[in-house]
Curated annotation (Swiss-Prot):
<dbReference type="InterPro" id="IPR006638">
    <property type="entry name" value="Elp3/MiaA/NifB-like_rSAM"/>
</dbReference>
<feature type="binding site">
    <location>
        <position position="33"/>
    </location>
    <ligand>
        <name>[4Fe-4S] cluster 1</name>
    </ligand>
</feature>
<keyword id="KW-0808">Transferase</keyword>
<keyword id="KW-0963">Cytoplasm</keyword>
<comment type="similarity">
    <text>Belongs to the radical SAM superfamily. Lipoyl synthase family.</text>
</comment>
<dbReference type="GO" id="GO:0046872">
    <property type="term" value="F:metal ion binding"/>
</dbReference>
<dbReference type="Pfam" id="PF04055">
    <property type="entry name" value="Radical_SAM"/>
</dbReference>
<keyword id="KW-0479">Metal-binding</keyword>
<dbReference type="GO" id="GO:0051539">
    <property type="term" value="F:4 iron, 4 sulfur cluster binding"/>
</dbReference>
<keyword id="KW-0411">Iron-sulfur</keyword>
<keyword id="KW-0408">Iron</keyword>
<protein>
    <recommendedName>
        <fullName>Lipoyl synthase</fullName>
        <ecNumber>2.8.1.8</ecNumber>
    </recommendedName>
</protein>
<feature type="binding site">
    <location>
        <position position="59"/>
    </location>
    <ligand>
        <name>[4Fe-4S] cluster 2</name>
    </ligand>
</feature>
<feature type="domain" description="Radical SAM core">
    <location>
        <begin position="45"/>
        <end position="263"/>
    </location>
</feature>
<dbReference type="InterPro" id="IPR003698">
    <property type="entry name" value="Lipoyl_synth"/>
</dbReference>
<keyword id="KW-0949">S-adenosyl-L-methionine</keyword>
<dbReference type="InterPro" id="IPR013785">
    <property type="entry name" value="Aldolase_TIM"/>
</dbReference>
Length: 289
């Protein structure tokens, strides 16, 4: 299936992204921008921002839509990773940093302690930086979630990814209701934290199902949602079922904000979980907690 014109992006210029890429290489840090082949890497790197991928790059799950490598081997966490991440945040002068991780189902706490260590190092090196975490479901271990939230992130993101009908195909190791419960627990237990989720379209869902998911997310007290076009990483991954028009993405945004009451819905073909994540600082000023 040929990509429509609105999904064509210019290849990033080496000189525009080189400084960020070189720094990440120097500090031996992974980014989801690189590991997941994000189409916005040129724009984000050129703006001096990145979404850090910790505890990776290998993931203990093999979701058929994802471009991150599968690795079921048990690996020790790198105790120097949080300090290196804090240094990168300081050297890049980031005002808002996003930290995500691969799934680490091999760890007793799912990697919660590493998230907290990263928060502590960023706050030590760059106290004015707001912090967003994009976390896995921790296999429903709510003690692990509580451990992460004890670090007091400004934003907690957990992606719902797709509509419930497609979970067996796209997220066979995840449970739709469990993801909703995680998001609701964040808002109920830590009401000052802004909650966020995201989903892809183009996997076989209908527009009506997308709206139903948005309604579910709002009922579970989610504040911010991202919606973007699924792009298959390769022939071994799930194929694209459809390309959603920019007009329909705008309709999702409009309904989500005006009818369902989200603080923000970022919905464009090239939107990804952390795309324009720094805008959350404006939302925090407009809707203080």
């Amino acid at each position: 299936m040929q990509k429509p014109e609105w999904l064509r992006v210019k290849a990033p210029q080496r000189e525009r992204i080189g400084a960020v890429a070189d720094l990440l290489l120097d500090l031996k840090l992974n980014t989801v921008c690189q590991e997941a082949s994000c189409p916005n890497i040129g724009e984000c790197f050129a703006g001096g921002t990145a979404t850090f991928l910790i505890m990776g790059p290998g993931c203990t799950r093999a979701c058929p839509y994802c471009d991150i490598d599968f690795d079921k081997s048990v690996r020790e966490l790198d105790p120097t990773e949080p300090e290196r991440l804090g240094e990168a945040t300081q050297r890049l002068g980031l005002k808002h940093v996003v930290i995500t991780s691969v799934n680490r189902d091999d760890l007793a706490d799912g990697g919660a302690s590493q998230f907290v260590a990263c928060i502590e190092q960023i706050r030590r090196r760059s106290p004015g930086t707001t912090i967003e975490l994009l976390v896995p479901d921790f296999c429903g271990d709510w003690d692990a979630l509580a451990a992460v939230m004890a670090g007091a992130p400004d934003v907690l993101n957990h992606n719902i990814e797709t509509v419930p009908r497609l979970y067996k195909k796209a997220r066979p190791q995840a449970i739709y209701e469990r993801s909703l419960e995680l998001l609701q627990r964040v808002r109920q237990g830590w009401p000052r934290c802004y909650s966020k989720s995201g989903l892809m379209v183009g996997l076989g869902e209908t527009d009506a199902e997308v709206i139903e998911v948005l309604a579910d997310l709002r009922r579970h007290a989610v504040d911010i949602v991202t919606i973007g076009q699924y792009l298959s990483p390769g022939p071994k991954h799930l194929p694209v079922d459809r390309f959603v028009s920019p007009e329909q993405f705008e309709q999702f945004r409009s309904q989500g904000e005006s009818e369902l009451g989200f603080l923000q819905v970022v919905s464009t073909p090239l939107t990804r979980s952390s795309y324009h994540a720094g805008e959350v600082q404006r939302l925090m000023q407009e809707h203080p907690r």
